[in-house]
Design a protein with these regions (language model features):
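Short secondary-structure junctions
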Residues: 174-178, 361
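Alpha-helical structural motif
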Residues: 131, 135, 163-166, 265, ...
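Short acidic/His/Gly/Ser-rich catalytic and metal-binding motifs that mark active-site loops
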Residues: 145-149, 178-183
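Short, charged, amphipathic alpha-helices and their helix-cap/turn boundaries
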Residues: 162-175
């Protein structure tokens, strides 16, 4: 049975880039990055004891969160113990060094996590009850760096900038590499930057919210900004089908849920310097009671756009239905080639359809989007969990059998 090969690499160079340094007359153009010396990069793949990654968006905060990694490596010689003064990397074992996890399967290498080390903890057999000395490395993705960076003035951030332009201006302010960005142009024009003291992450999140788009860090370590047209339209792609009745990729477990977490039937959206714009759905309020949503100090230029936001939000959230909360894939399942590829390749906003057979023979079927990816990997186990949610914003999608129904789907702004 073929299983993906884990690659775990610690990069002791400075700066945000995960690439090897470019050395004149030696380096490879379009592969290495320009630097003054070779980065010390250590492959710890053959020492891996366990890997846990968690990236995604939470339903309650309605935003993507900082991704996290726990990497446990066998460390019998204390090479990665920062207290070992005779260790080969002693002076290099400091916080914010880079770590990257990938998986190779069928000659394709898939990114799993790229981030920055926050701490090292070494435990010994007599302390942990294990037979081996283990160093546990914990890391976070680039959201943490943006959260740590305080900014005020954003150069060039004038009224009329599209949201994507503003995102790039903020990333320029913290000197984030151009090669580590995937930024859509955006549809909403911004006010001039307020110039207040805040974190870069707060500034980026305000722009993303003003656009009604999405901001996250992908598995390669790049900042990704999607405008609302991409966010809304991505559900219209061809879904990967997971089913327990042989009509799709088999899965280990699927958790179905029906609750009120995603219901919002009144939204109050206020732009900076504007008046509160309110939208509500009385039928939903009568049915579910009042579920309110507030967002203020946004940067769209007009109250009309703020009202569009409020109306689109309520139209997308006034109703709910049974949905798949999460689906688990076991990569050690026999004859699981398609499942392994899906587990490694699918990521945020990818549409999936889940089919579950109920007692009595009826089926539950739902098409949703992936908004969270969690992996738990050990020498004899590999499970990938996708958390799923309804689209961030509903939109009418032409020729789509689910999101292209007149009198049912929403015309977005």
């Amino acid at each position: 049975m073929a299983i993906p090969v884990i690659n775990a690499v610690i990069n002791f160079s400075t700066g945000p880039s995960f690439a090897q340094a470019m050395i004149l007359d030696t380096g490879v153009l379009d592969t290495n990055v320009l630097a003054d010396s070779t980065a010390i990069i250590v492959d710890v793949s053959n020492r891996v004891n366990r890997i846990e990654t968690n990236r995604g968006r939470t339903a309650l905060s309605d935003q993507f969160q900082t991704g996290a990694l726990t990497l446990r490596i066998v460390d019998q010689n204390g090479d990665f113990n920062p207290q070992n003064v005779s260790g080969p990397y002693y002076e290099l074992l400091t916080p914010m060094k880079k770590v990257q996890i990938t998986a190779t399967y069928g000659s394709v290498t898939y990114p799993i996590f790229s981030g920055f080390i926050t701490n090292y903890v070494t435990t010994y057999p007599d302390e942990s009850g294990e037979d081996l000395a283990i160093t546990t490395i914990q890391a976070v993705d680039a959201f943490r760096l943006a959260q740590l960076a305080q900014i005020s003035t954003v150069t060039g951030a004038t009224a009329g900038d599209l949201s994507g332009t503003r995102v790039n201006q903020i990333l320029d302010t913290i000197s984030w590499p151009l090669s580590m960005r995937d930024v859509d142009a955006g549809l909403t024009t911004m006010q001039a930057d307020p110039g207040t003291n805040r974190t870069a992450l707060a500034a980026l999140s305000t722009v993303a919210s003003s656009e009604y788009g999405s901001l996250y860090v992908d598995a390669t370590g790049s900042f990704v900004f999607q405008d609302r047209s991409v966010t809304a339209g991505s559900i219209g792609g061809t879904p990967t089908v997971f089913a327990d009745n042989a009509t799709g990729i088999d899965y280990f477990d699927a958790s179905w849920i029906l609750n009120d977490v995603l219901i919002f039937n009144k939204a109050t959206i206020t732009r900076s310097g504007g008046t509160a714009q309110v939208a509500s759905n009385q039928d939903s309020i009568d049915k579910y009671f009042l579920h309110s949503y507030f967002l203020d100090n946004l940067l769209m230029q007009t109250d009309a756009v703020a009202l569009d936001y409020a109306q689109a939000y309520v139209a997308s959230r006034a109703e709910t239905s049974i949905r798949v909360d999460s689906i688990v894939l076991d990569l050690y399942t026999d004859n699981y080639n398609s499942g392994i590829i899906a587990a490694l390749d699918l990521d945020f906003f990818d549409p999936i359809k889940v089919i579950t057979t109920q007692p009595g023979g009826s089926t539950l079927e739902k098409t949703l989007q992936i908004f969270g990816v969690r992996m738990n990997i050990s020498p004899n186990s590999w499970k990938t969990t996708f958390t799923t949610l309804e689209p961030v914003i509903d939109a009418f999608i032409l020729n789509d059998t689910i999101y292209g129904t007149l009198d049912y789907n929403v015309l977005s702004y």
